[in-house]
């Protein structure tokens, strides 16, 4: 199976790639080169098909601008929405029938109620809005051939673990420095 993974140098991708059957042909795309990333590429641009096989069986779209706060609002939209448009367009060009898209819990917005799959999204940040728009782009791709295309949207909450450098790691460092925090 030929698998294209965007955001291949990221935290989640490193774990996904480790768990994939190594008999697959894995093609990693990212902005920075790592042992996992073979192709340096910006998903805000059209994908260069010349460096890939003619057939891609699965796209795992993990590329995103995600730290919040930390980016200008337009950066979330530029990467997350343009990236979704370019990935789904590429999927159509190579006749890929399956995409896994990693969104976020952020499209639900900040509310104290339990979130379930049927909870109506109400994002209140540029990041959450950009992820919801990217979900809709992926859904539109699937709907253009719903009988043959498979789309899985994953909305993780806080992602952390060994090697993660985000919010949980910062929180743990602050706790070790005896900083008070309130949630």
Can you annotate each of these PLM segments?
Residues 125-152:
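Active-site Tyr-X1-5-Lys
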Residues 43-82, 90, 108:
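NAD(P)H-binding glycine-rich loop region in Rossmannoid oxidoreductase-like domains
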